């Protein structure tokens, strides 16, 4: 790679392959692409199991699809047969589709490019803009990354309209440009970024398989060893509440506290995700201790009530008011780190589900939950199971770090290899 960052040369990226030296063209997007009508079909009008014509919904652009969409393998829903539009424009190889709206200016005009669509009937759907390069200035695979580049999205952030939801329209592309090098250079850029995307996809699959392994092994080991001890949470220790008496002015600085999302999202509390709250001298608030089991108290769905996490840190931290903590006093029956896996096991989730009460919002009946009988492996087996599962968790963290590296590498190239 050649670094042009400090060279006073117009219309070349900061980073490029060394065999290319000529300047890039800056092309107005509205001159590069022709635009075609899209439909406004909602999710209720789509079906993943049956149909003839597939539909690209903007929600899939925002979450679920890669920059390069392989029409032969990436999953897209069909339009229900009874509501297929009378007129539509099918995607061709290399067509792009932009999401025209988002709550985040960074995601407005997020784009995908369609590959391998021969024999596939796919149309662009709700809140999308369908574009095609009929000028033959670009190669297949280049446009999707050019429209994902920082230089393009910097322009979009400037012109996106809205307050809570930001949007763009076809006429906004009169104001935006992308850099277009020779087709040979385009092809080489696309090949590199496609290779990185494929490696990211592989890395995600590795992580998913390890997560599936740990879930299955957790349930299997509990089934094999989980009937050794009959007890209850109230026999194992005592519970305590989260923060109380706080107003919005108290948050933002001060002492660290564990958020609801931290408890909900992690089997073990993530110590890099603390937020902060002012705790006055002499103020009485419960402090979370190492080994405490934390639970969510309420949610809009019963499945999300009583989701647990274990704190294994040593810092003085507090707990948000929408969760409660449980301190294990009886260390002869329970090994606190094991509970980071126990509370996420299928048997435990089935056990806690009936204690979620409510209609529109569900709350955990804490008193009944603590008194209810639970079964645990022996103390030695709890330690043994924890060691096995924690070794896989360590492997998952290693793979996640590698995924972050590849993702960061891709974002760096999207910033440096385009104008």
Where are these regions (language model features)?
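Sequence-specific dsDNA recognition surfaces
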Residues: 30-46, 60-96, 234-247, 261-293
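Amphipathic alpha-helical segments with low aromatic content
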Residues: 1-25, 175-176, 181-227, 380-419
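Structural detector for helix-capping/boundary residues
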Residues: 15, 27-30, 59, 150, ...
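Short, ligand-facing micro-motifs at secondary-structure edges
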Residues: 62-77, 96-125, 141-145, 154-157, ...
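A short glycine-rich beta-alpha junction/loop motif
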Residues: 6-13, 121-129, 138, 150-153, ...
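Non-catalytic DNA-recognition/assembly elements of restriction-modification systems
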Residues: 12-40, 221-244, 371
